[in-house]
Amino acid sequence: MRGIALFVAGVLVGAAVQATVAQNAGAGVVGLNHVGIAVPDIPQAAAFYTEKMGFREAFRNSNPQGQPTAIYMQISRNTFLELQQANAQRPAGVNHFGLHVENMKTAVDMFRQRGATATDPAGPSAFSGAILSNVTDPNGVRIELAELGPNSLQRKAMDSWK
C-alpha cells in the first residue's frame, strides 16, 4: 500500500512538473525525468516495481560488496523512478524529483534570475554520467536538474527504449 502511495505521489509531482515545463518552454527544461524515493530494502522495492508495476530496470549502482545503492527503474522512454537506500540522512519516502534540462547553464541561470537558489553544476556524475545541479523549494523539496549527455546512463536507457 505504501508503494502505491509513493507511486501516486510521483504521478502528482509529474503533473505539477508538466505545468512548469510548459511555462519554461525555450528555457531548457525538457520535462520530468525521475522521482527519487528512499527505501529500506532496494532489492525488495525493485522486485515490486518490476513484477507488480511492470517497470524495467534501466541501470544500477552497487557498493564494493555488490549491494545496490541505487536502481533506476524505467517507467516510460523519458521517465524513471530512482530507488535509493534509506539511511539516517535519507529517511524512507519521496526524496526528490528530477527535471531533464537541455543545457544546465541556461537552466541554472534561469532559475537564479527568478530568485531560486541553484547549486553550481557538478558533473558528469560518477554514477550516471549526467551533469547535475539542485534547487530546493521553500518547503525543502529537492529538485534535481539533470543534463543528459549522450554517454549518460539515462540517455542510453532512453535511446534503447522500445
Place the predicted regions along the sequence by residue.
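Solvent-exposed coil/turn segments that connect beta secondary-structure elements
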Residues: N78, E102-M104, L148
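Core segments of cupin and vicinal oxygen chelate
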Residues: A27-V30, I37-F80, Q113, G129-N134
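Intrinsic, low-complexity N-terminal interaction/targeting segments
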Residues: T79-L81, N87, G123
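Short, flexible, solvent-exposed loop/turn segments with mixed acidic/basic and small polar residues
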Residues: A25, Q85-A88
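Vicinal oxygen chelate
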Residues: R2-F7, L12-G14, A19-G28, V30-P40, N61, I71-Q74, A88-R112, I131-T136, ...
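Short, charged/polar, Gly/Pro-enriched secondary-structure boundary elements
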Residues: N78-E82, G140-I143
